[in-house]
Amino acid sequence: MGAIPKTGTISPEQKDSQEKNLFQKIWSWEIGVIPLPLYTVLAVIIILAAYYNELPANMLGGFAIIMILGVFLGDIGQRIPILKDIGGPAILSLFVPSFLVFYNVLNSTSLDAVTNLMKTSNFLYFYIACLVVGSILGMNRIVLIQGFIRMFVPLVAGTIAAVAAGILVGFIFGYSAYDSFFFVVVPIIAGGIGEGILPLSIAYSQILGSSADVFVSQLVPAAIIGNVFAIICAALMKKLGDKRPDLNGNGRLVKSKKANEIFNQKEAEAKIDFKLMGAGVLLACTFFIFGGLLEKFIFIPGAILMIISAAAVKYANILPKKMEEGAYQLYKFISSSFTWPLMVGLGILFIPLDDVASVISIPFVIICISVVIAMIGSGYFVGKLMNMYPVESAIVTCCHSGLGGTGDVAILSASGRMGLMPFAQISTRLGGAGTVICATVLLRFFTS
């Protein structure tokens, strides 16, 4: 007879299996897409290099710092309850690095590396060019044209209402119309950080004479506060729609089946082609350079002319389809891989904590809230007049006050209406681009 194993004992095979399962479980934990053990090793290497002043003060060292922090903060921001629903990754990626600089956690070696990447090598401008050009060229042309026609009145009405409310409430609290408009209202409705705040900061710096980082720290707080309240308003509109079925299109914006079919058509996703992505890099760089060239003759900041020229080329259908696909694939790669790392760089260099604290106050927050309420309220009532469902119209118009594509996702998720994404993109991209262009022209006019 074989020996009977004692109760509670584990055979060597079972022990090996348990250890293997534990090892696999640990490797299944991820920070972003990186297994936790590997992420830990990478982080330790980078931290030690920075501590012993061996971190290269160039693009390599800069990317190492912003990537290791951006991957971590973006992942954590997507996991924390409540925070994840109000733009957590963006908030953490911008402000945690700012705290690290304020409390001298990051040494001069790390700061030099990030400075060389963001300022000397101008990764910031490269990111802006890829996002703006790729997002515009990648839009469905029919949706772009028809969406602009359909959303023109609600967008214009919402923008006018937001501007009027912001200036009026600002006046009550002692803000000048100039400060309320250019530093509170405009950042909220500019289309996010990458495609709104950053081009704006460049334009403001060229017109007013200070460096772009000065304006980033002044513009970002309004954009983030506006985004948070826009998400809250979207959730409240969902509750209103649940209680009032007559106001609710259940995800349909217009009271016309044919019109909804136009906006819901999807183009087949092209297979990823790295050569086309390379062409996308060339297109993004050239559009940026073209904007700078035109600036010499038109006297409008190059970043704004880049937006206008990309939209004009898309509207005229000039580029071969595969070139547009290359620019769009590059846009998706850059936006999905470098958004949180870039915001880490912005937080380190462009958002001094003391400057941000000096901007935010109770009146400032109330002005931001009034802008969003005016935007969503105008969308509601204009939607009623234009054969749209008021709840959906209000939610789509509300996207104009969110943090770009990230804000669109958060707002539509909070309202349970992800099917409105094509309209949200029109509201955010075209509305944001229009805001940036108009604000720049007006600022030039008032300071000339």
From Swiss-Prot:
Location in the cell: Cell membrane
PANTHER family xref list: CITRATE-SODIUM SYMPORTER, NA(+)-MALATE SYMPORTER
Transmembrane segments: 31-51, 60-80, 86-106, 123-143, 153-173, 182-202, 214-234, 276-293, 297-319, 333-353, 359-379
GO molecular-function term, one example from the UniProt record: symporter activity
Gene Ontology BP term (one): sodium ion transport
Gene induction: Expression is induced by the two-component regulatory system MalK/MalR in response to malate. The regulator MalR binds to the promoter region of maeN.
InterPro entries xrefs: 2-OHcarbox_trans_Prot/Firm, 2-OHcarboxylate_transport
Pfam families from the UniProt entry: 2HCT
Family per similarity comment: Belongs to the 2-hydroxycarboxylate transporter (2-HCT) (TC 2.A.24) family.
Secretion signal span: none
GO CC term (a single one): plasma membrane
Name of encoding gene: maeN
Alphabetical UniProt keywords: Cell membrane, Ion transport, Membrane, Sodium, Sodium transport, Symport, Transmembrane, Transmembrane helix, Transport
Protein name: Na(+)-malate symporter
Membrane topology listed for this record: Multi-pass membrane protein
Species the sequence originates in: Bacillus subtilis (strain 168)
Function: Acts as a Na(+)-malate symporter, as it catalyzes malate-dependent uptake of Na(+) and Na(+)-dependent uptake of malate.
